[in-house]
From Swiss-Prot:
<comment type="subunit">
    <text>Part of the 50S ribosomal subunit.</text>
</comment>
<keyword id="KW-0689">Ribosomal protein</keyword>
<dbReference type="InterPro" id="IPR030878">
    <property type="entry name" value="Ribosomal_uL15"/>
</dbReference>
<dbReference type="InterPro" id="IPR001196">
    <property type="entry name" value="Ribosomal_uL15_CS"/>
</dbReference>
<dbReference type="GO" id="GO:0019843">
    <property type="term" value="F:rRNA binding"/>
</dbReference>
<comment type="similarity">
    <text>Belongs to the universal ribosomal protein uL15 family.</text>
</comment>
<dbReference type="GO" id="GO:0003735">
    <property type="term" value="F:structural constituent of ribosome"/>
</dbReference>
<protein>
    <recommendedName>
        <fullName>Large ribosomal subunit protein uL15</fullName>
    </recommendedName>
</protein>
<keyword id="KW-0694">RNA-binding</keyword>
<keyword id="KW-0687">Ribonucleoprotein</keyword>
<dbReference type="InterPro" id="IPR027386">
    <property type="entry name" value="Rbsml_uL15_N"/>
</dbReference>
<dbReference type="GO" id="GO:0006412">
    <property type="term" value="P:translation"/>
</dbReference>
<dbReference type="GO" id="GO:0022625">
    <property type="term" value="C:cytosolic large ribosomal subunit"/>
</dbReference>
<keyword id="KW-0699">rRNA-binding</keyword>
<dbReference type="Pfam" id="PF00828">
    <property type="entry name" value="Ribosomal_L27A"/>
</dbReference>
<dbReference type="InterPro" id="IPR021131">
    <property type="entry name" value="Ribosomal_uL15/eL18"/>
</dbReference>
<comment type="function">
    <text>Binds to the 23S rRNA.</text>
</comment>
Length: 143
């Protein structure tokens, strides 16, 4: 078996151990910076190959004052709540009256089916929810 001596043992005693001038082996400056410093300057091949999405701007952030985050409930969920607790809701002209805001919701979405006519009061309704409520013989009231 061949035993090859390590390069560093050969270089011991030579003051700079193969790094040229002593100042070239100091700090990160000689290496081109720490971390991701210089990825658009002198580490370009690595950037293009391994981090192609790292450079450039993508999309935008909407201003927080423009974003409306409403708590939503689907018609199917609402129908389940009503069918379990019919006694707790008011009935007017054979229609169950529900105020969504008392249930801590603000918007009604149209997923699911309604089995009985209802008068639903909410801040907002989706178009499909409006159609389904009316087709079931109910009404919607926007607050």
């Amino acid at each position: 078996m061949i035993r090859k001596s390590k390069k560093i043992t050969k270089l011991r005693g030579s003051r700079t151990c193969g790094y040229g001038a002593a100042k070239k082996h100091r700090g990160a400056g000689h290496k081109g910076g720490k971390g991701l410093a210089g990825v658009t300057k002198h580490r370009w091949i690595h950037t293009v190959k391994y981090m192609p999405d790292h450079i450039g701007k993508y999309g935008f952030k909407r201003h927080s004052s423009l974003i409306k985050e409403l708590k939503v409930i689907n018609l199917g969920q609402l129908d389940e709540i009503v069918s379990k607790n019919k006694e707790s809701f008011e009935i007017v002209d054979g229609k169950i009256v529900i105020d969504i805001t008392t249930l801590d919701y603000e918007k009604v979405l149209g997923k699911g089916k309604i089995t009985c006519p209802m008068i639903i009061k909410a801040v907002e309704f989706s178009e499909s929810a409006k159609e389904k409520i009316e087709s079931a013989g109910g009404e919607f009231v926007e607050l």
